[in-house]
Amino acid sequence: MQHFFTTFSTEGSKISLEALLNAREERAILQQQLITQYGQTLLCITLTAMGGVKKNALLDYVFTKALENLTALFTQLNITAVKEIIRPLETGHEAYFVLPIDARTLKVLMIELEESIPLARLWDLDVFNAKGNLLSRTDFDLSPRTCLVCGENAKICARTHKHEIDEIVDKIQSLAQNHDFAEHIGEQVYLALIQEARLSPKPGLVDAINNGSHKDMNLHTFEQSAISLKPFFTQFVLKGMMTAHLSENQILSEIRPLGLLAEKAMFKVTDGVNTHKGAIFSFGLVCTAIGRLLAQKSLVQSAVDFDVKLICSLVAQFTQGLTDELKNYPEHLPSTAGVRLFQKYGLTGVRGEAENGFNLIQTLLPQFDEYHQLEWEHRLLILLLNLMAINSDTNVVHRGGLAGLYFIQQTAQDLLTDQHLVTDKTALTQALMKFDTACIERNLSSGGSADLLALTIFFLSFRGN
């Protein structure tokens, strides 16, 4: 686990009080110049940086993440800065954006951003209206920002020097480390989705060879979808950290809105095609569990192994009773494919997999290790066959009924019984190509097994595989 944590350097030049006062004065002059020249809303960004050092690797990271989040927000709002000034000075990081947006609207958005992720607590996002008036939280009947260390009024703690500088710097380091960790997890999920998509040949599925049984998507569609989802998986980890104080049965309702936003982003880049809806659900739960465990100190920097059982157990707790929603689905709500398949066949799909703690994956991981002498992709193809052989894949049933599921499972089982074929990659590839053709002819696609394969790849990445 150690390789997922970064310790940022706090080394830097100490700045004199005179230099800091001069920088503050220059900042005020520049703000007034921009307001006078452009007569529009001004956003000014600085950082919470205690002590004599105002610029180092730690604060560089915090500033970079502030700019990344603001850029993403501007893109989402479809607004472009009239004027932009970025100044990573030794006296402290500064950024200025003159924006064509109502000041009060922007202030509300900045407050939401400040409260959206833990790292944002380190960003000072000041909004001035066209008249040069600084908008504050009290203008919106909101309480002042809280202290990094104790959670009390931040201004009072600063004024009374309640906390030692080292204590505050340690807290900043912790926030940065946790955010960086969340981004590493998001990156690992993205890489797992890409590996799964490119793995070839995969019977009936989109891969690097063909589109399988799909006429509305290809490998590029999957790759673009995975790119769009990467920041959301980071957000799920952060959400897990932020909700660590809640009980497990409250978590699902807390993360559902984020899952819907992820789906919306996916549909936007795929022109309405469902590439990763199941993966959003599964990985969203897993990432949230990881964030929760980190916040509760169950995962520590000195940890060597990533405990898949612990993660899956927590997911099971999050989703306890989830399949009951299928049993008691309200008649007035529009029916979904998952609901119809449960009502007709009793299949619980991805909901059931999550509720049982992804037991299928945990069962197959030892089998993956049995083929340690084989190359990585060869082992993944064998793993996919094992998943297809035993997974009651609702994607398959949706396309081909129970007969289609029986065909997929029986064919996969037959291939796995021939150990010579399984361990000979050339022979296995040829057999999978024939299986692929048969799936395409029957319009069958094991999308559920593909999602479980991606999740397994993700789990394996923590073992150094």
Swiss-Prot record:
Residues 183-465 are annotated as: 2-(5''-triphosphoribosyl)-3'-dephosphocoenzyme-A synthase. Keywords: ATP-binding, Multifunctional enzyme, Nucleotide-binding, Nucleotidyltransferase, Transferase. GO terms for biological process: prosthetic group biosynthetic process. One of its GO terms (molecular function) is triphosphoribosyl-dephospho-CoA synthase activity. Residues 1-182 are annotated as: Apo-citrate lyase phosphoribosyl-dephospho-CoA transferase. InterPro entries: CitG (IPR002736), CitX (IPR005551), TriPribosyl-deP-CoA_syn_CitG (IPR017551). The keyword Ribosomal protein does not apply. It holds the Pfam family CitG. Its EC number is 2.7.7.61, 2.4.2.52. It catalyses: apo-[citrate lyase ACP] + 2'-(5''-triphospho-alpha-D-ribosyl)-3'-dephospho-CoA = holo-[citrate lyase ACP] + diphosphate; 3'-dephospho-CoA + ATP = 2'-(5''-triphospho-alpha-D-ribosyl)-3'-dephospho-CoA + adenine. Bifunctional enzyme that catalyzes formation of 2-(5''-triphosphoribosyl)-3'-dephosphocoenzyme-A, and then the transfer of this prosthetic group precursor to the apo-acyl carrier protein (gamma chain) of the citrate lyase to yield the holo-acyl carrier protein. PANTHER family: 2-(5''-TRIPHOSPHORIBOSYL)-3'-DEPHOSPHOCOENZYME-A SYNTHASE, TRIPHOSPHORIBOSYL-DEPHOSPHO-COA SYNTHASE. In the N-terminal section; belongs to the CitX family. This is Protein CitXG. It comes from Haemophilus influenzae (strain ATCC 51907 / DSM 11121 / KW20 / Rd). The lineage of its organism: Bacteria, Pseudomonadati, Pseudomonadota, Gammaproteobacteria, Pasteurellales. The gene is citXG.
